[in-house]
Amino acid sequence: MESKYKEILLLTSLDNITDEELDRFKCFLPDEFNIATGKLHTLNSTSSQLDLKRWHGVCSEEDRIFQKLNYMLVAKCLREEQETGICGSPSSARSVSQSRLGLSFHGISGNAC
């Protein structure tokens, strides 16, 4: 259940980022995971959910990747949601994540790749 919950948090977070932010997120993936570079270049916001869902390990490391991107508020929200045990059902986790993370991404500056 925890794995599914982390997956929902990651995918919800990726739904709420711009294409520029997604490009920066992708810059950290080759260092952390064994993902073909060709797949990363074709990854866009519409395919991110399906492709990243297939890569084992991404969900367990999203917090660290968001910290590298200087998205400290987002990383903190993800940790808080996990620690408070809101992972009862995927739909409740998704609705909480959307309300908290939707505002957190836009306007946060980070290091460019």
Swiss-Prot record:
Tissues where this protein is expressed: Expressed in monocytic cell lines and primary macrophages but not in B or T cells.
Keyword Transcription: no
Keyword vocabulary terms for this entry: Inflammatory response
GO biological process: cellular response to interferon-beta; cellular response to virus; inflammatory response; negative regulation of AIM2 inflammasome complex assembly; negative regulation of protein-containing complex assembly
Domain (Pyrin): residue spans on this chain: 1-52
Induction note: Up-regulated in response to IFNB1 or virus infection.
Keyword RNA-binding assigned: no
PROSITE patterns in the cross-refs: DAPIN
Leader peptide range in chain numbering: none
Protein purpose: Functions as an inhibitor of DNA virus-induced activation of AIM2-like receptors (ALR) inflammasome through interaction with AIM2.
Subunit record text: Interacts with AIM2; disrupts assembly of the ALR inflammasome complex. Interacts with IFI16. Interacts with NLRP3.
Name of the molecule in the record: Pyrin domain-containing protein 5
Taxonomic lineage: Eukaryota, Metazoa, Chordata, Craniata, Vertebrata
Gene from which the chain derives: PYDC5
